[in-house]
Amino acid sequence: MDELKHQVMINQFVLTAGCAADQAKQLLQAAHWQFETALSAFFQETNIPYGHHHQMMCTPANTPATPPNFPDALTMFSRLKASESFNSSSSPSMATSPPPPPVSWGMAPPMANQQSLWTQGPSAQQTHPPPGWPSAVNQQAASEQKASAAMEAER
């Protein structure tokens, strides 16, 4: 049972610390299988051997978070101008936006016989809720219908 427990701890340590399984086993054994103690020892720089320390100091390559050579990137950005176009034709730049389309919705009131798409007209609504509902619900529904009819009349 202890062997299974140790294997689970090693796997958990590998997932947490991102180290190799043999290194995790060594650290856990040195910490008498105390997970937090071994994890603290792993993340302290004094416990990293010199050979591994050099690898940690190198800049990673080919990772999504690694930018290109920074001075070269700055030089490339400094050469860009806001008015430059990526193609050589005399067409306007992609940075300029076309004129907005004319807005037609919301400008004119709806016609008298036209119902709103979002609300149903008074004729389409139920006049009374189902008979099993409490009277308070029936009164609220009636007042909401009156308010809806009043709002439709104002339009």
From Swiss-Prot:
Name of the protein in question: UBA-like domain-containing protein 1
Composition bias, Low complexity: 83-96, 139-155
Pfam families, sorted: UBA_8
Region (Disordered): 81-155
CDD domains referenced in this protein's UniProt entry, alphabetically: UBA_F100B_like
Biased composition (Polar residues): 112-127
SUPFAM superfamilies reported for this sequence: UBA-like
Family to which the UniProt record says this protein belongs: Belongs to the UBALD family.
